[in-house]
Amino acid sequence: FIAGLNGLR
């Protein structure tokens, strides 16, 4: 994913 959607990556 992209840093911002969930902050996971």
Swiss-Prot record:
It comes from the Eukaryota. This is Uncharacterized protein SMPP16. Nacreous layer of shell. It comes from Nautilus macromphalus.
